[in-house]
From Swiss-Prot:
Keywords: Golgi apparatus, Membrane, Protein transport, Transport
GO BP terms in the entry: Golgi organization; intra-Golgi vesicle-mediated transport; protein transport
Localisation per UniProt entry: Golgi apparatus membrane
Subunit description: Component of the conserved oligomeric Golgi complex which is composed of eight different subunits and is required for normal Golgi morphology and localization.
Family membership noted in the UniProt record: Belongs to the COG2 family.
Lineage: Eukaryota, Amoebozoa, Evosea, Eumycetozoa, Dictyostelia
Topological category with respect to the lipid bilayer: Peripheral membrane protein
Name of the molecule in the record: Conserved oligomeric Golgi complex subunit 2
Function, as annotated: Required for normal Golgi function.
Stretches with biased composition (Low complexity): 388-424, 652-663
GO CC terms of this entry: Golgi membrane; Golgi transport complex
Main subcellular location of this protein, as a coarse class: Golgi
Region (Disordered): 384-424, 644-669
Length: 904
């Protein structure tokens, strides 16, 4: 098949090569390049036809087109020669389409070429004009830059002048304030002249001039307040300066003047504060007995004076002055009267008076000093409100400045610079005007240091020789400090300052907690060790009497909670760790560690008692295994001789596990399994108390604190670990109990072998009841679990069930082995006898019927095993899942038919 590409306008044609049968003649994308709707050759309408290509033409217009990828894809379908041929055909097709397009729009194309004539001249003229405009703009921009630089220089110069002017005005303002303060000092001096000051202070004696004196007192209050406010104003003004500005000589000189001014204020105000403080405290003390108008007026006057004086000391940042005066004038003399050896030692060489001393101090602070503390708290509250208002104003001004800055962005450059200068100055003023002052805390700075110093002279208060006395004095001091915190430190910030003060730390450092705890540790640990752990474990047992009813048993259990004295001693020792007469919170971790150590010592005491018994048991088990091996070898050697004899002697024990001699297992009667049950009961009781009662007691005693969650985790982990340690004793004791029970239960197992001699040629009647030895197999276990352990409610039922399973498993296995050996022995004997007698009638039949001796033995075994299963069920063991019994049952199950035959 061939396809012609014709150029209708030029009459030429492009003819493709003959068609070929290859993949290149197919359009793999499912499309063919056709300009017409038909499939025939081109017509005069200009439609072209060509061979379908091995690629799609859309691939060339894709944004992800890559030559290497294109060639690789095409090579997967056709060879390179076919691709090259198709590309050439497609190129010719594109050329043909381009020619057709030009011929179709030839008139437009020709018009376009005509319209472009002379256009290059216009472009050249436009380029020249553009270059001229560009140079003019550049020169204008240079002029603008020069003018802008000049304007910025002028603005900076103006800014510098304004800043200097501002600093000069600030200097003048501060200087004027200093001069005004000098005038205030002169007025204060005139008012506080010794003669005038005495006149003011003698209000109680001169009743006629009382009103005049009070007016003078108002003037004095006003003067001190003005001095304080003026100094505060100077501080604010100085705080507006930057660090560089403060280095100026004029401001350095001002700083020195301000320091001198601060000292001068202290010098002037201190005597006024001292006299007013004395009078105020004395008036408060006297008002408890005498109340009149003069005292009340004087008290109000002194209160106002103290208020402004404290405010002034706070402003000049000299809080140590009122602290020192209050401590020296008020606290020290009174504490010297209260804290004395006479008051402390009511009885000679004792500290019985410490409680009264602390009560007297609290009473003194409440009655004489509480009003003064109220004044200091009022100043603290006012300061807090003032700082809060300053913070709010600062935030508002910052918001306003941000708004101004946003508005200023649309102004011209000069306005922006000016506004920025002003805004920066405003920001500096508001930011630096916030001056932080300290709160007054006379309790931590005046009262507590004097208390610490006064108590330090009496070493007997902190003596650790007698733990009970040490604990008593400590808790009196602890309650005393707590009373001060509750009554006088209601503010959280003041309470924090109080507890972080050096005097607070110094007071508690006087108490030698390490020595006290060592004494407590020695007292508790040695008492537990020597009084309870030096006695052998089984000698401590207090066993309940047998002739009591269940109710009486319960009452006895309540009266004597534990059977071991060491368990009761452990309880008493643990109680001492958290008792109100021993526990100190600062030693919480040490007392908790002692608590855990006591439990560990109790565990070690019981464990040390078990170790020799476990070693003895291990040796006996090894001897037992050796005996079993020797018996098996002897049995294999003599098995032929033992079956030839018609009436052989009873063979040795046929069980796989020989019983351990009860005379060597636990030769001490006190260390019997019954006594071990009481030990297990004590372990469960004390473990229950530790995990519940003592855990709650410890958490309650320690109380709530910041790291409460972490403390609870430590307590839980420690108690859990101790309880796990105690629980590990239970399996060890259980093994001793179980092995003793196994040896006791296996003693009757040898009776099984006597069934052969019982029914062999004895003409015994057919058995109808189980043998007596079956009950003896269970009797030791039944007595222990159903009688001894049943009255001890603290032993869990699952422990009793585990004991039953552990004991009955080897007993049942031994029963199975003995029954198997018996059946095999009787069967072999019958076979040999039958061969010897040949065809004679067997002599093993009885007069009671046709049942043989072999059948009687088998029937007796079946009855015994069936009864044994009933006994096992009484212990709560499911026979359907108890594998040892299922194996035993399978041996005697075929003999069940003998009962059915007998019934017939």
């Amino acid at each position: 098949m061939a396809m012609n590409l014709k150029n209708s306008s030029s009459g030429g044609n492009l003819t493709s090569s003959p068609s070929y049968n290859s993949f290149s003649s197919l359009n793999l994308s499912g499309n063919s390049f056709n300009n017409g709707s038909g499939s025939g050759s081109g017509s005069g309408s200009g439609s072209n036809e060509y061979i379908p290509l091995c690629f799609s033409k859309d691939v060339f217009t894709s944004n992800t087109f890559e030559v290497d990828q294109f060639i690789s894809d095409c090579r997967k379908r056709v060879n390179l020669e076919s691709v090259q041929k198709d590309l050439r055909e497609y190129s010719k097709h594109l050329d043909s389409e381009l020619i057709e397009l030009i011929n179709k729009e030839y008139q437009s194309f020709f018009s376009l070429s005509t319209s472009l004539v002379g256009f290059d001249t216009i472009l050249n003229e436009f380029s020249i004009s553009q270059s001229s405009i560009k140079s003019e703009i550049k020169s204008f921009n240079n002029e603008i830059v020069k003018v802008r630089g000049l304007v910025e220089d002028k603005l900076n110069e103006k800014k510098s002048i304004e800043q200097k002017k501002k600093l000069l005005q600030l200097y003048i303002s501060i200087s004027e304030t200093l001069n005004n303060m000098n005038h205030l000092f002169d007025q204060l001096y005139q008012l506080t002249h010794p003669n005038d000051f005495k006149k003011i202070n003698n209000n109680n004696n001169n009743h006629t001039n009382n009103e005049t004196n009070i007016n003078d007192g108002d003037v004095l209050e006003l003067l001190i307040d003005r001095i304080s406010n003026s100094f505060y104003q100077i501080q604010n003004q100085m705080s507006s300066l930057t660090n560089d500005e403060l280095k100026f000589n004029i401001f350095q000189s001002l700083s020195l003047k301000i320091m001198d001014l601060s000292n001068k204020i202290e010098e002037k105000v201190e005597p006024i504060f001292k006299e007013s403080l004395k009078r105020f405290i004395n008036v408060n003390n006297n008002n408890k007995e005498i109340v009149d108008d003069n005292n009340e007026k004087q008290n109000k006057y002194d209160e106002r004076i103290l208020l402004v004086c404290l405010k002034t000391f706070q402003t000049i940042d000299k809080l140590n002055v009122p602290y020192k005066l209050f401590k020296t004038l008020i606290v020290k003399p009174r504490l010297a009267q209260i804290v004395s050896l006479r008051n402390l030692e009511i009885n000679k060489s004792t500290t019985d008076g410490l409680s009264q001393i602390y009560n007297s101090i609290i009473e003194f602070l409440k009655n004489q000093c509480s009003s003064f503390f109220d004044i200091s708290n009022l100043i603290n509250n006012n300061l807090k409100e003032k700082q809060s208002n300053n913070n709010n104003n600062n935030n508002n001004n910052n918001n306003n400045n941000n708004n101004n800055n946003n508005n200023n962005q649309i102004n011209n450059n000069s306005n922006n610079n000016n506004n920025n200068i002003n805004n920066n100055n405003i920001n500096n003023n508001y930011n630096n005007n916030i001056i932080l002052y300290n709160n007054y805390n006379f309790i931590s700075q005046s009262v507590l240091p004097e208390i610490d110093e006064s108590l330090g002279f009496f070493k007997q208060i902190f003596a650790t020789g007698i733990p009970d006395l040490f604990y008593k004095n400590y808790y009196l001091t602890f309650n005393f400090i707590q009373s001060i915190e509750v009554n006088f430190l209601t503010n959280k910030e003041l309470l924090t300052q109080f507890r972080q003060s050096s005097s607070y730390s110094s007071l508690w450092k006087k108490w030698n907690f390490a020595v006290y705890f060592q004494l407590c540790f020695t007292n508790i640990a040695q008492h537990f060790e020597f009084n309870y752990l030096r006695i052998p474990l089984f000698d401590q047992l207090t066993l309940p009497t047998n002739n009591i009813t269940n109710n009486n048993n319960n009452n006895n259990e309540n009266n004597n909670e534990f059977y071991l004295k060491s368990t009761d001693g452990l309880r008493l020792s643990m109680d001492k760790c958290w008792s109100n007469s021993n526990f100190i919170f600062d030693l919480s971790s040490k007392f908790f560690k002692l608590f855990l150590q006591l439990i560990a010592r109790y565990d070690t005491f019981i464990s040390d008692t078990l170790i020799p018994l476990e070693l003895e048991l291990q040796q006996q088990l090894q001897q037992q295994q050796l005996q079993q091996q020797q018996q098996q070898q002897q049995q294999q050697q003599n098995i032929g001789d033992s079956v030839i004899k018609i009436t052989p002697k009873s063979p040795p024990s046929l069980s796989n596990q020989s019983p351990i001699s009860s005379s060597t297992t636990l030769n001490n009667k006190q260390s019997s399994p019954e006594n071990f049950i009481y030990i297990i009961s004590d372990i469960y009781k004390i473990k229950s108390k530790i995990s519940t009662n003592y855990k709650e007691l410890i958490i309650k005693t320690i109380g709530n604190h910041q790291n409460q969650h972490e403390i609870l985790n430590l307590i839980n982990d420690g108690i859990l670990e101790s309880c796990k340690t105690l629980e590990q004793l239970i399996p060890r004791i259980s093994i001793i109990i179980e092995n003793h029970l196994i040896s006791k239960c296996l003693e009757p197992i040898e009776i099984i072998s006597t069934l052969r001699s019982t029914y062999r040629m004895t003409n015994k009647p057919v058995p109808t009841k189980p043998s007596i030895y079956v009950s003896n197999l269970i009797s030791p276990l039944e007595i222990l679990i159903n009688n001894k352990a049943s009255s001890l409610h603290f032993i869990p039922p699952e422990i009793k069930l585990n004991w039953a399973i552990s004991v009955l498993t080897p007993v049942t296995e031994s029963f199975k082995n003995a029954a198997t050996n018996l059946i095999q022995s009787v069967t072999q004997s019958n076979d040999i006898i039958n061969k010897m007698v040949k065809k004679s009638k067997p002599t093993t039949t009885t007069s009671g019927g046709d049942m043989s001796d072999m059948d009687k033995i088998s029937l007796q075994l079946y009855l015994d095993v069936d009864k044994f299963g009933l006994y096992i069920q009484k212990f709560g063991i499911n026979l359907l899942t108890f594998e040892p019994f299922l194996g035993l049952k399978s041996i005697v199950e075929p003999f069940k038919k003998l009962i059915l035959n007998q019934n017939k």
